[in-house]
Amino acid sequence: MMRAATAATAATVAALLAHETSCAGAADGQDELSGKPDMFGGILIEARTLPKSGKAFDEQLGERLSQWKAAGKKGVWLKLKPEHATLLATAYAHGFEIHHANKQHIVLVKWLPETPSTIPQPASHYVGVGIAVIDKNNRILVVQEKFGPASRRGRDFWKMPTGLVDNGEDLETAAVREVFEETGVRVAFEGVLAFRQQHQSGVEQKTDLFFLCKARPLSSDITLQEAEIANAVWMPLSEYLSKPLWPEFSAYWWMSRLAAEAHVEAGGDLPGGRLGSRPTAFVPNLLPLGSRPGANYIYSAATCPPPQGDHAKARARWEQAQAELKAAQQQAPTSKL
């Protein structure tokens, strides 16, 4: 899951860009260069601590890199504004590479481990895949990640294999690759069930497109990608759906249900060739995230009805999402043709 890791690692860059590189009222440059940990085992160098002196920066950066490497840290991120331009050559000398740049800053990164880098490439859009692999015994292939937000959800948090699509890579190829990289299971791609659109994500707060795919297992033995995956199992579908992984009627709850129901309706593998059902347009379902404020559009051939019955909290979240959408539409400027 080297590339899958980049989906999570991209959030590191987002955190870097969101972090203020200078503090109001603070002096430009402190006595000691320092950094703060990110959620993926890396370091964000705090620009407010950059020494004014190039010599001091050279000495302190070398010391910190040695310390961080010994501590098992991964990517080290450094953002330089124009006033820090004199430090650029020193950063190069210590092995930093430019990740991306704009008019306000240059972002550099250095990968410390001896293993292949999982640092994401700069992007205009992110395209990711999640793969629902369900076998004839109604078991779904799920994983636990070692790093990233999912790893912080607890020991009983399981998810489908996921990851970023490489530049020039088809969705089908990416889905097959991600499952094999994370679990060692070979699969046959069967199609796209839905896709989610999320804005202000990743490196430059770009739009993220996440495609929920369906795949059929061609093997069952699991071989973990130990660098990124803590565990992987074939879990009974009923057990997976019964776990309180996501609030009911939230975006990710809906995608899990969609994958399960698509498998059941397909009736498993059928002999011979056949046409699919009558083509149906993917329609947008605006659903609350559930785990934090906000909502996403989930595009699928099925619609998610408003929560009914005893789902008062889910109904409230759903209504809030619809209200926020309506307010945004009213505030949007009218196009002039």
Kindly give the residue locations of the regions a language model identified.
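Unchanged
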Residues: 129, 134-136, 146, 163-305
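Conserved donor-binding loop and adjoining core beta-sheet/short helix segment
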Residues: 27-63
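Conserved beta-strand-loop-alpha-helix junction that forms the acyl-donor binding cleft
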Residues: 78-86, 146, 165
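N-terminal strand-loop-strand
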Residues: 112, 116-160, 186-187, 191-194
